[in-house]
């Protein structure tokens, strides 16, 4: 008897080709389209460029998923996780901005929706596996599954999957993890899939492209405050700390207001005084740190102090680090080479060679023992 796989079919080219490959490998495949956002229900009006479109983006994606399912001859189910997404992902996203941190919704989206709500939903189908069109690989040969980087390093998504627990990966397949993106496109065209030339999705996970600062105003009021240099010199007013992140250059509007020709960057934020700190120069020393406290850690395998590599943001080059555990869900990470713009709220993903062993959230950032005013 064929083993059964339930795949998340998003209406994009990656999950389309993943479904095709599963069929070619001899699995009994059914697909599920997840709808996780409703602009009317969620008051998504400001900053929404698709607000007046005749057909919403998620409906267009569903129609593309349906075309692919029909082409492949597989059944497509449709499920709404709108409330789950709001409660488990988006509320946290907004809370983090309110706390003056910069969250990564894609990490929570995977942890809470694609590999939790979806897995719970899949139980009624009794599949042997679930599958997604992620660029990642899983080694199922040992006692516990290992999350391994994708062949296409530019598309590797293990950073976004780094918070998953071992049990969430146990019955998961990533059919395109061993393929470069160019090959995925080629396969889609060769098999005349409707999504072959469709652009990759961008923007906020399951929400899409938004004019971000305006979008946040749907949920958080902007609180103006002072923009100052680290020595206290007043520069101008800012439009709300939530609109800025550490290392940001764009949107400061300082040009012509000072006597320096260097570009200005956000180097600090102080929620207690609602002050945004800026300094000229991409390499300003205050943008660099050598240590961070990592909390809410999810780890796969035995915990040990020692040397690893890390990514402090998506697509960052691997950084040599040393970690020291404080308790079961907290460690400190040290990087004496100093790294620019390590930002509270973002994820620090830890790797041992090609294996992603876990991650946690950047809580506090230090340089030479001094806490940075990053949050």
UniProtKB/Swiss-Prot annotation:
Protein's GO biological process: tRNA wobble position uridine thiolation
UniProt-annotated stretches for the region Interaction with tRNA: 155-157, 313-314
Q: One MF term in GO for this entry?
A: tRNA binding
Q: Which controlled-vocabulary keywords does the entry list?
A: ATP-binding, Cytoplasm, Disulfide bond, Nucleotide-binding, RNA-binding, Transferase, tRNA processing, tRNA-binding
- Name which cysteines form disulfide bonds: 109-205
Please list the residues that make up the active site: 109 (nucleophile), 205 (cysteine persulfide intermediate)
Q: Which domain of life is it from?
A: Bacteria
Q: What class of enzyme is it?
A: transferase
Q: Record-annotated residues binding ATP? A: 8-15, 34, 133
A single GO CC term for this protein reads: cytoplasm
Q: Where in the cell is it found?
A: Cytoplasm
Q: Which residues cross the membrane?
A: none
Entries under Gene3D superfamilies matching the protein? Adenine nucleotide alpha hydrolases-like domains (2.30.30.280), HUPs (3.40.50.620), Translation factors (2.40.30.10)
Q: What is its main location?
A: cytoplasm
Q: In the Enzyme Commission scheme, what number(s) does this protein have?
A: 2.8.1.13
Q: Which HAMAP family match?
A: tRNA_thiouridyl_MnmA
Sequence similarity: Belongs to the MnmA/TRMU family.
Protein role: Catalyzes the 2-thiolation of uridine at the wobble position (U34) of tRNA, leading to the formation of s(2)U34.
Instruction: Write down what this protein is called.
Output: tRNA-specific 2-thiouridylase MnmA
Q: Which organism is it from?
A: Acholeplasma laidlawii (strain PG-8A)
């Amino acid at each position: 008897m064929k083993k059964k796989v339930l795949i998340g079919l998003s209406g994009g080219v990656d999950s389309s080709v993943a479904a095709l490959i599963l069929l070619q490998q001899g699995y009994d495949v059914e697909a599920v389209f997840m709808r996780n956002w409703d602009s009317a229900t969620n008051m998504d009006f400001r900053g929404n460029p698709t607000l007046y479109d005749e057909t919403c983006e998620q409906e267009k994606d569903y129609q593309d998923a349906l075309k692919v399912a029909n082409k492949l001859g597989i059944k497509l189910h449709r499920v709404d996780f709108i409330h789950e997404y709001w409660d488990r992902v988006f509320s946290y996203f907004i809370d983090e901005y309110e706390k003056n941190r910069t969250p990564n919704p894609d990490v929570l989206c995977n942890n809470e929706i694609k590999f939790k709500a979806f897995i719970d939903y899949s139980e009624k189908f009794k599949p042997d596996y679930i599958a997604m069109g992620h660029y990642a690989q899983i080694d199922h040969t040992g006692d516990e599954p290992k999350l391994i980087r994708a062949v296409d390093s530019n598309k590797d998504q293990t950073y976004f999957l780094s918070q998953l627990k071992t049990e969430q990966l146990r019955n998961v397949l990533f059919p395109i993890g061993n393929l470069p993106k160019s090959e995925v496109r080629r396969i889609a065209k060769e098999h005349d899939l409707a999504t072959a030339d469709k652009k990759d999705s961008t923007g906020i996970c399951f929400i899409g492209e938004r004019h971000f600062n305006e979008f946040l105003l749907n949920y958080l009021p902007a609180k103006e405050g002072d923009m100052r240099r680290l020595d206290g010199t007043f520069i101008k007013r800012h439009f709300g700390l939530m609109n800025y992140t550490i290392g940001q250059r764009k949107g400061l509007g300082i040009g012509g207001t000072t006597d320096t020709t260097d570009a200005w960057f956000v180097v600090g934020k102080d929620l207690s005084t609602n002050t945004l700190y800026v300094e000229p120069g991409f390499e300003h020393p205050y943008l660099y740190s050598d240590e961070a406290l990592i909390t809410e850690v999810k780890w796969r395998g035995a915990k040990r102090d020692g040397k690893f590599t890390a990514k402090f943001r998506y697509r960052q080059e691997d950084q040599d680090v040393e970690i020291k555990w404080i308790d079961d869900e907290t460690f400190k990470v040290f990087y004496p080479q100093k790294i620019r713009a390590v930002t509270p709220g973002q994820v620090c993903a830890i790797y041992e060679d090609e294996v992603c062993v876990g991650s946690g959230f950047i809580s506090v950032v230090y340089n030479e023992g001094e806490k940075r005013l990053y949050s």
